[in-house]
Amino acid sequence: LQYSDSYRCVYRNTAHHSEDDLNHNGKLFPMALGFLEYEEPICLYQYTANRMSYRAADCYETEYVGFGALEGDFCWSVAEDASVFCTLHPDNYLMQFEMGCTIPLEQLGKKELTVSVYVNNALAGELVIDKSNNGGTLSLPISSLLLLDDAQNQVMLRCELWNASTVTPNDKRQLGFPLRSLRFIRK
């Protein structure tokens, strides 16, 4: 395999082989008449090319940090700072955050909920959830200047948590943003 920035060597070793021909020419005691010894390199590569979609159903135990268990096909953020780790090459993108359900703004006594979005600890912008877009897909453009080259990028959602018991009396969780998927579209 030739070098490509789409692959990363995650394991490298050498396999040692030794063989004999076990040719005994019909004699009572088999004796090797030939012996061969050689080594072969072993490389295990991980595919790391641009991954443009991070669905909760596929990533909640790996790339999603600060999110709760999968609920159907989405996860609630359960920490004020919840992150999705992404493999992207620097470029200008439109980030699309698909919500898994609505946030009960009315029961919480709020007209809107603001989610600050950070890319690699730099503020990329804010998503404002209100009655018009609650439960839908929210978009935010990001510049290539915010993305790391040849490294994993962190998209962090920072929002105020609310008590789930406001809606479901026996639910003691603190919840934030219901993320179904994060997608990147090249601009």
Residue ranges of predicted features:
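C-terminal luminal/periplasmic domains and tails of membrane-associated envelope-modifying transferases
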Residues: L1-K187
